[in-house]
Amino acid sequence: MEESLLPVYIHSAEYVELCDNVQSKVPRRASMVHSLIEAYGLLKEMRVVKPKVASMEEMAAFHTDSYLQHLHKVSEEGDNDDPETLEYGLGYDCPITEGIYDYAAAVGGATLTAAEQLMAGKTRIAINWPGGWHHAKKDEASGFCYLNDAVLGILKLREKFDRVLYVDMDLHHGDGVEDAFSFTSKVMTVSLHKFSPGFFPGTGDVSDIGLGKGRYYSVNVPLQDGIQDEKYYQICEGVLKEVFTTFNPEAVVLQLGADTIAGDPMCSFNMTPQGIGKCLKYVLQWQLPTLILGGGGYHLPNTARCWTYLTALIVGRTLSSEIPDHEFFTEYGPDYVLEVTPSCRPDRNDSQKVQEILQSIKGHLKQVV
């Protein structure tokens, strides 16, 4: 593939507006992210592609018809106390809001559009920052996720690429994606996440390794609060080096949730965009077709800072430290700079424990045939 192929950036005004209005957990986040990327002049370094909207049939590649039909129904009629609603995981952390089905179809369609660009050889890197909703199950919404666009993207890529690697750097375990592929050896899932009693979703211990034919094809890296860039990168590189050699992927899907960044209301990890960027750079040097998704990130200016920095890294641009004037400029006070400073929180990741986890993972990967 020609190196001159520009990265693809999935975007349309309608898509951003839908994400802004329906994502009640992160209102206007999609606009903030896009505006900062645009303000730094990064759009001209990419090919902007308008996303399609996923059909019910396309979403049913993973989700059950009954779940999708119920989501469609409550999206139009509102929640009429239907007992099925709770069974489908709707309510609580996945509130029913008007237009939720259209939003799910838009995010799913955007990730499918990105995957199709990669499959057609039109680019080597395709980005859908409003995507990455990794908790949704086949017939159940979960953890703010109504549709698992990451799974849909992987399934689409599998139509062309025999082995697809999924790497999840969100603060939370990528349980929905792991579950979807836990029985196959064609998709390896790697998740680095906080693992602590009572912390959602409560899965993803190092001993969770997949089932049946997929045994040893689920890789979990359970981490504790306070981890910073250097240690995170050492762990990430150590795991991905082994994974790449063992699995030999043909395409990669990366979920880069920004709830690991210092200042996030989750108050857990203590990362900066540079730390995540180093991990991203490591994956990109494989020169494989790579689909990039967002995910969590509840400190909205820091999420925009993070994904803008990562976008610049992808296109090979160094950004000025000063936030450029744009629609959301006032949100970046009091210092109005791109950098995020780690807090003074202690790192709870004991070096010996981390080494034990890495040894465990290496042992599991040796079992991969």
Swiss-Prot record:
Q: Name one GO cellular component term.
A: cytoplasm
- Keyword match Hydrolase: yes
Q: What class of enzyme is it?
A: hydrolase
Q: Name one GO molecular function term.
A: metal ion binding
Question: What's its EC?
Answer: 3.5.1.98, 3.5.1.-
Residues bound to a divalent metal cation are 170, 172, 259
Cofactor comment: Binds 1 divalent metal cation per subunit.
Activity regulation (record text)? Its activity is inhibited by trichostatin A (TSA) and butyrate, 2 well known histone deacetylase inhibitors.
- Cellular localisation: Nucleus; Chromosome; Cytoplasm
Cofactor names: a divalent metal cation
Q: Which reaction does it catalyse?
A: N(6)-acetyl-L-lysyl-[histone] + H2O = L-lysyl-[histone] + acetate; N(6)-acetyl-L-lysyl-[protein] + H2O = L-lysyl-[protein] + acetate; N(6)-(2E)-butenoyl-L-lysyl-[protein] + H2O = (2E)-2-butenoate + L-lysyl-[protein]
Organism's domain of life?
A: Eukaryota
Q: Which residues catalyse the reaction?
A: 135 (proton acceptor)
Binding of substrate occurs at: 93, 143, 298
- A Pfam family for this UniProt protein? Hist_deacetyl
Which residues lie in coiled coils?
none
Described purpose of this protein according to its UniProt entry: Histone deacetylase that catalyzes the deacetylation of lysine residues on the N-terminal part of the core histones (H2A, H2B, H3 and H4). Histone deacetylation gives a tag for epigenetic repression and plays an important role in transcriptional regulation, cell cycle progression and developmental events. Histone deacetylases act via the formation of large multiprotein complexes. Also involved in the deacetylation of non-histone proteins.
Record-given protein name: Histone deacetylase 8
